[in-house]
Regions:
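N-terminal acidic leader/helix
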Residues: 1-37
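Mixed-charge, Lys/Arg-enriched low-complexity segments
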Residues: 31-63
Length: 63
């Protein structure tokens, strides 16, 4: 999965299969804002879960 651009923000997911953990790095105008962490099971995180985390973040922050 690649980056998600939404409302002027860029969300770049990355993950480790070994540790079963991931993070979504949030950027605004190229500047790092914060990191959203998550865990998952299997070989890859579910794309829908990443999109849901981004949507929840935007809603919570009023973006």
């Amino acid at each position: 999965m690649g980056a998600i651009d939404k409302h002027g923000y860029r969300f770049e997911p990355e993950f480790s299969v070994i540790s079963q953990k991931g993070a979504i790095h949030v950027y605004k105008n190229g500047d790092f804002v914060e990191e959203i962490t998550f865990s998952f099971n299997g070989k890859f995180p579910v794309v829908d879960k990443i999109e849901q985390l981004v949507d929840e973040y935007c809603h919570k922050k009023g973006i």
